[in-house]
Amino acid sequence: MREYKIAAIPADGIGPEVIAAGLQVLEALEKRSGDFSIHTETFDWGSDYYKKNGVMMPADGLEQLKKFDAIFFGAVGAPDVPDHITLWGLRLPICQGFDQYANVRPTKVLPGITPPLRNCGPGDLDWVIVRENSEGEYSGHGGRAHKGLPEEVGTEVAIFTRVGVTRIMRYAFKLAQARPRKLLTVVTKSNAQRHGMVMWDEIAAEVSKEFPDVTWDKMLVDAMTVRMTLKPQSLDTIVATNLHADILSDLAGALAGSLGVAPTANIDPERRFPSMFEPIHGSAFDITGKGIANPVATFWTAAQMLEHLGEKDAATRLMSAVERVTEAGILTPDVGGTANTQQVTDAVCEAIAGSNIL
């Protein structure tokens, strides 16, 4: 019996709702497979913890998480706590503290979900966006001077290192090489950002020589939004900086139908530390407590987690169950359905068990 220890951090907004759904589905997979077990410990870190303790997580939070095989994360952010506090107090310290430098965000149109793109047919939108997750625009360097005065100034410094850019390019090329189309698009803005982004382009060209079987091209980030919208079938694997990929992956989720179906994995490819898996939709306080949050993104990121742990059969079984459920029209309101979170979750669990969901 293979055993895994998972740290669950539901955190804020709809995070607890979708993580509860995800844990229910993982339990169903565990029962169906019969050859692995998942032991979960839940941490109450997040905005409520901050209001009580003045920090989003305890000082030894990373040390507590080191003993786990993976982290299952909900969402962070609250209306009454500044966003820079919630993000820099919990999610980013985990990503950067554990050097989860590869943020992997798959996107495709699931059966039964109608995308907003008029000319997008089956298979036309099937991408993986690789986001540099450790430096770039979110490196945390900068400051403010003369605060409150007319001459106040704020700086936000993007940091690009040869080590950081090389490893994310190599990861992206390897991923593209493993996918059927062997196609990679490198997103840049080197026409206007003439230092870090020019280095980014140069390193992409250097790394490409290691992968002669991968076809790659380069695209300015603003033009990339147009290409994603008008020619989705021309794309497959995409690599971009921390900020650019953050924006483009939200666009990708929307083009696939909803952020409620968009997952992400924060990976330490060297496996020195636990990797973290989460939906990208955020805390969504406008629907918190209504029971209508879409759990599909959480199921998909659970599949990413299972695959990372080596349970590929269980990951495939989970995604097959999700696609059976969406194809049957059991959908939450954000993708045009009338089902609630629990109904979708129960249907996926039944599909995993082999029951007839129709």
Curated annotation (Swiss-Prot):
Keyword Manganese: yes
Keyword terms, alphabetized: Cytoplasm, Lyase, Manganese, Metal-binding, NAD, Oxidoreductase, Plasmid
Cofactor comment: Binds 1 Mg(2+) or Mn(2+) ion per subunit.
Catalytic activity: tartrate + NAD(+) = 2-hydroxy-3-oxosuccinate + NADH + H(+); (2R,3S)-tartrate + NAD(+) = 2-hydroxy-3-oxosuccinate + NADH + H(+); (2R,3R)-tartrate + NAD(+) = 2-hydroxy-3-oxosuccinate + NADH + H(+); (2R,3R)-tartrate + H(+) = (R)-glycerate + CO2
Cofactor(s) the protein requires to work: Mg(2+); Mn(2+); K(+)
InterPro entries per the UniProt record, alphabetical: ICDH/IPMDH, IsoCit/isopropylmalate_DH_CS, IsoPropMal-DH-like_dom, TTC_DH
Pathway involvement of the protein, from the record: Carbohydrate acid metabolism; tartrate degradation; 2-hydroxy-3-oxosuccinate from L-tartrate: step 1/1; Carbohydrate acid metabolism; tartrate degradation; 2-hydroxy-3-oxosuccinate from meso-tartrate: step 1/1; Carbohydrate acid metabolism; tartrate degradation; D-glycerate from L-tartrate: step 1/1
Alphabetized SMART domains for the sequence: Iso_dh
GO cellular component: cytoplasm
A GO MF label: tartrate dehydrogenase activity
PANTHER family named in the record: D-MALATE DEHYDROGENASE [DECARBOXYLATING] (PTHR43275:SF1)
Listed name of the protein: Probable tartrate dehydrogenase/decarboxylase TtuC'
